[in-house]
């Protein structure tokens, strides 16, 4: 389960679990532009989102982009596998080099504290709840939520906003 400081001001105030169950203090990403996304392996949006995210990561990782992927099984049971299976699929099929974290809940009583913060910072069009797999949050270099993108918004269409935050022409 992810933890947080008592009054979080940015995503850097959170600690989450990596795929091996070890704590990761998100402050290690200070100075980076982040995409935080809830992912699923068996969703109709899986191929397009992972493909676009992998391309964006390859293109901008050296300029300071990081993608933090959090598997979630809350939408249609579309992420039923264990974390090892998920990592294997993502790294083999989509050649993902960005971190895949431990499975989380993004809604409800057991929602990860990080996701509670993200949702309270940028509510969606239909309220605060995450509606489906591949909801994306864009985070600036100071750890603040800049924007929220719907599951059907392709990561490639976020490129202009990412470049602006990275300061890349």
Swiss-Prot record:
One of its GO terms (cellular component) is cytosol. Transmembrane segments: none annotated. GO terms for molecular function: peroxidase activity; phospholipid-hydroperoxide glutathione peroxidase activity. Pfam families: GSHPx (PF00255). Keywords: Cytoplasm, Oxidoreductase, Peroxidase. It catalyses: a hydroperoxy polyunsaturated fatty acid + 2 glutathione = a hydroxy polyunsaturated fatty acid + glutathione disulfide + H2O. The active site is at residue 43. It is found in: Cytoplasm. SUPFAM superfamilies: Thioredoxin-like. Disulfide bonds: none annotated. InterPro entries: Glutathione_peroxidase, GPX_AS, GPX_CS, Thioredoxin-like_sf, Thioredoxin_domain. This is Probable phospholipid hydroperoxide glutathione peroxidase. It comes from Solanum lycopersicum (Tomato). The gene is GPXle-1.
């Amino acid at each position: 389960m992810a933890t947080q400081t008592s009054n979080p001001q940015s995503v850097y105030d959170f600690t989450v679990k990596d795929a091996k169950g070890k704590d990761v203090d998100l402050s290690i990403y200070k100075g980076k532009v982040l995409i935080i996304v809830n992912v699923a392996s068996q969703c109709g949006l899986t191929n397009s989102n992972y493909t676009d995210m992998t391309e964006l990561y390859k293109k901008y990782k050296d300029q300071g982009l990081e993608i933090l992927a959090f598997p979630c099984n809350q939408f249609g049971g579309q992420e039923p596998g264990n974390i090892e299976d998920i990592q294997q699929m993502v790294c083999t099929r989509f050649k993902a080099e960005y971190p895949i974290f431990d499975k989380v809940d993004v809604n409800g009583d057991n929602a990860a504290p990080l996701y509670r913060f993200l949702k309270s910072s940028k509510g969606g069009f239909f309220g605060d709840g995450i509606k489906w797999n591949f909801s994306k949050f864009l985070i600036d270099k100071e750890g603040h939520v800049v924007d929220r993108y719907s599951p059907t918004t392709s990561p490639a269409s976020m490129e202009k906003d990412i470049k602006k935050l990275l300061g890349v022409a």
